[in-house]
Amino acid sequence: KIAELTGLPFASADDLFDATQNLDGFVTVSSSLKTCAVNLSKLCNDLRLLSSGPRTGFAEITLPPKQNGSSIMPGKINPVIPEVVSQVAFNIIGNDCTITMAAEAGQLELNAFEPVVFYNLFESIETLTSAVQTLTDNCILGITANEKHCEELVDASVGISTALCPT
């Protein structure tokens, strides 16, 4: 009936005993969400590093300003959106640990820890979805390259010597 009502391909588990005893399918989904969160946090770390500056740091890109910068560092833009997305990722990683431990905690024919699995799984799905949307709308779409500074870095790079001395 759920498949008919939603139009989604819901079906009973092939092995109902296994589905009652083990929550490995939920662990797999959670692990995939964790992997996505880890990669998203890594991307945010890269954005924070590449936008560090203005006088020191990489300063290769500029993030859209979303919060007042520092009073002691004029021109600094705080990378608040990448920071909040990384914090969401940390929470999803923690949720994955909770889901893993809950799946492991079942005994014999029953796992009584499904409520915490579902709570954390749904939270991870919802917060990851929101974090991606927030990062896209409030950061990614507004990033600008600091072309002049990047050109200066290329001109000063010792990597240019490779082009002058082909092997």
Locate each region found by the language model:
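Catalytic-core signal marking the mid-to-C-terminal active-site face
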Residues: D14, D18-N22, F26, N45, ...
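Alpha-helical support elements that line or immediately flank enzyme active sites
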Residues: S30-K42
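Structured DNA-binding interfaces in DNA transaction proteins
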Residues: S31, L49-S52
